[in-house]
């Protein structure tokens, strides 16, 4: 085994796998350090990928030739497009996954990645010199040199599990925590915080009364995450839906003092949008019930994940809770739910590349940055892995901004605003969500991936073919036109203004779809259904996209005004509050400054004017020197 790598990635979860694979795709010699190869790709909490906002991230990871989309397609056992009744911008692909199939597919993908080696062991310390990371030391004493290191430790940094009145050190159930790395961070001056997350009990599906619960099928046919997946071939299953009852709530209220969150045992903050069942009852006491999704964990595994009742109440209380829920009265508990606390780094310690400001060559991704969720972790891992290679090799950084994708929105939120609770992606966080749709992730990002060199030959060829077909189909739809009188003969009611309208124009009407225009122009039948969907969505959003393009151009103008070397004490007109905030956060651009709390439009105007004055001075200085 070699003892030196271009990039070392610590942690084999969702962030670590994407980071390691991305680095290796760029040709870097890469090592993935994990406790055991068998735990690579493990789904620590819910057996599902995607969802609202999260599904966008999976599609964006796929567009950059990442792994998660293809692995989810291989392991998915129920696919649903959430928000299907709403517009395409807020629809979210989601898949229920077979835990074993998902992990096996991820492990196979890691094995097949050229330039990537796996080292089994516990990373115990970071090695550095002259303000730059130089490698790592394992708990067994082995040392490995690296040009860059990516840390993706999930909940393992000083992880502490809580179950009722009991607590014990662990990274997740039955796995040891990572203690040495926390000490390394503290020695380097990083301020560590504590966050909390939780998981529900696991149930024996053979003891559930499935006849007493509502059943929810998936989409037919299922829609894959990856553009490279022609069709889903794994057998599909149904999930169940039940609800808590007033009796459930009474059990929880009677025992809430035994919950670590309410006994004072846990002081850290949990995810607002994924609260424990005891938190739901305390915060929403007027509700008569809370929905629970019964999600099978595998095709040949009877274990069921009851999504919606995350808890750290004592095991006997969890059993009592289950007896009050329709369909679960006689269910057997496979494993109790629990809460886990872990260390995280303030993400404002990071550059938009996810490199730390304190130590060059050190990158962080996933829950260590204060996020929650597999998809958020995967997207960060991919960005960190790409930039680790570029930093180690002296290349230009790969920065994704808020107009590029949800991954850019997330990273900008983290490094600009920081977090005070685990960060979860939602479509509402994106200003340009009409542009940043799940259906066009490859159209937005694959060309950028090709320029970076992280997209392989198969995807590159597929992308070129698809984009050519899309351009041809759109041109065809724009070339075919009809008058209002002609349209009326086909059953379409248009404004009788004498204006000819193209097939593309007609598709912008809410009530007109591809089938209607194809009935008028049979030549449109030659367009594949997959391409037709894109043309129709583009037509529906055409007017709005033109407006949003102007907004994006204004955003990018502000992002182009760099603030990196400004002495804010020399900027006249800034309030002391604004000056202090700008000095503390050191935003890279005027646009980023505007996203800081407490920075007013007036302060931004002062900064922009100052930059213009300084820009006018520089040419005069050069001329004088000559």
Curated annotation (Swiss-Prot):
The gene is mnmG. Keywords: Cytoplasm, FAD, Flavoprotein, NAD, tRNA processing. PROSITE patterns: GIDA_1 (PS01280), GIDA_2 (PS01281). It is found in: Cytoplasm. Disulfide bonds: none annotated. This is tRNA uridine 5-carboxymethylaminomethyl modification enzyme MnmG. It comes from the Bacteria. Belongs to the MnmG family. InterPro entries: FAD/NAD-bd_sf, GIDA_C_N, MnmG, MnmG-rel, MnmG-rel_CS, MnmG_C, MnmG_C_subdom, MnmG_C_subdom_sf. The keyword Mitochondrion does not apply. Homodimer. Heterotetramer of two MnmE and two MnmG subunits. GO terms for biological process: tRNA methylation; tRNA wobble uridine modification. FAD binds at residues 11-16. NAD(+) binds at residues 270-284. GO terms for molecular function: flavin adenine dinucleotide binding. Its cofactor is FAD. NAD-binding protein involved in the addition of a carboxymethylaminomethyl (cmnm) group at the wobble position (U34) of certain tRNAs, forming tRNA-cmnm(5)s(2)U34. GO terms for cellular component: cytosol.
